[in-house]
Amino acid sequence: MSLKLFRSTGFHSILTPGEARLALHPGWAVAAVAGWVGIACNAWLWQALVGMGSLLPAIAASIGIAGAVGFFLSVFGWRRTFKPAATFALLGSALLSGGVWTQTIPPTSLVDDATRISALLPAWASLFSWQVPILLVLLGGLPVLWLWNTQLRRLSGPAQLRSNLGGIFLWFFVASVGFALLGRLAAA
């Protein structure tokens, strides 16, 4: 008869070394969502690429929007709050993208004090056309499905706090650069 020092219960934790290495780091998840919102959900960038607008303000808006979303997600980058906050950011940016696309609003309206967020939303009538629902599904729904099916690496409390604080400072800097550039282009 042999002596067993450890008993196996058949239960495997998410914190096993192999699974922890395969899971996505929360910082990379923030970068992926911020990049998606800044590039794919930026209607101004796509309008500029097809020749309907200026490219430099669209790029500045991409940098500023990605930085703002990254900052927001770094603040809410904790284990229980990240996915709901990222869902809100993805669906909200898809809705705003539909409004910008259907109303052809210039990117400099982001730094205009007179512009309200409600002016960027799509009109109610456009919600029943084909463009806005398709944009909501492609730009918001599919990334939300990816997000909720992606395992994120569980970090210890101090490591998660360091990651969040580093992300807050980095993304604040990125947003400041993007919106400062957009403000200079709007003033010129």
Regions found by a protein language model. Name each.
Residues 2-187:
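Transmembrane and membrane-interface helices of multi-pass
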